[in-house]
């Protein structure tokens, strides 16, 4: 599997809606598409007001698998970008849950 970044701008009206979407995403990925896609992590974006978007890191067999997962889980997938390499300078910082 290759690594991809998925940009989901203004995907949800509030953090609660994002939590519901995350549950659907996990279910589809783990139960229906486990051979084709693996969710690694997401960064939640403040989009103004209560709205949130995400930058998600996935491993997948193809961009088409990511699009199919997004469709099945009812998620936006504004842009899918293949990751060429990873440079880790420092580990991700720990942040308090919102």
PLM-predicted stretches and their roles:
Residues 1-41, 45, 63, 68, ...:
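Short S/T/G/P-rich N-terminal loop/turn motif that feeds into the first structured element of a domain
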Residues 2, 52-54:
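Residues at beta-strand starts and edge strands
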Residues 39, 44, 50, 80-83:
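Generic preference for hydrophobic/aromatic residues in regular secondary structure cores
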Residues 45-47, 54-58:
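Amphipathic, hydrophobic secondary-structure cores in small proteins
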Residues 59-89:
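An amphipathic, aromatic/His-enriched active-site/gating alpha helix that lines ligand/cofactor pockets
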